[in-house]
Curated annotation (Swiss-Prot):
SUPFAM superfamilies: S-adenosyl-L-methionine-dependent methyltransferases. It catalyses: a 2'-deoxyadenosine in DNA + S-adenosyl-L-methionine = an N(6)-methyl-2'-deoxyadenosine in DNA + S-adenosyl-L-homocysteine + H(+). Transmembrane segments: none annotated. S-adenosyl-L-methionine binds at C12, D30, K197, S223, G224, T225, D241, M242. Pfam families: N6_N4_Mtase. Keywords: DNA-binding, Methyltransferase, Restriction system, S-adenosyl-L-methionine, Transferase. This is Type II methyltransferase M1.MboII.
Amino acid sequence: MLEINKIHQMNCFDFLDQVENKSVQLAVIDPPYNLSKADWDSFDSHNEFLPFTYRWIDKVLDKLDKDGSLYIFNTPFNCAFICQYLVSKGMIFQNWITWDKRDGMGSAKRGFSTGQETILFFSKSKNHTFNYDEVRVPYESTDRIKHASEKGILKNGKRWFPNPNGRLCGEVWHFSSQRHKEKVNGKTVKLTHITPKPRDLIERIIRASSNPNDLVLDCFMGSGTTAIVAKKLGRNFIGCDMNAEYVNQANFVLNQLEIN
């Protein structure tokens, strides 16, 4: 088995062939979207993209333990195919999550503009880890909370006490994209990786679907966000990327976390 708590420079297929089967509790995958934003994201056609996608999915599924969970990022269009494929492989559908990026609304003129991505959440069994109390979010209606907190009764007469940690998390997630967060004087700056995911978004996934010392896998590590967040949360990780610059930079950050 490859060394854990390290990002390896290799392609996803060679990497997955060397990861022990049924050793992973959580896989968080941000793969190519076939949007031609870079060489690694470019395919001749959708008919070429799908077999590539299904191939790495098959290998990832072998690595999940019997109660493992899988999250996959992609466009809504691609996720329609991926969702159907995962169901055909016997995976259990949990959620179709919409990530509202709150920026980058695009320039669509023949349809609604896009400012969101899809995150598919599947599990291998009904006994998968899900720590719902770890990912509660603030209540939206403060008046309702105030009334219930003071009297223990809602205005409709039902008895209810708000959870001090917030309400249960839903399927629409509001996180600004990393490129939006790192704007300078209102202008987008060039990032090392073109599509890094926000750390707080990845943190929500890892907190919800893994426990301390679990192994988290990402076979398209990019700038290393999954590994960095996993390490900070006390999880083990293993991952790869083909880009030497991404891998070296991410491993440097991880080593600094170790030192500190």
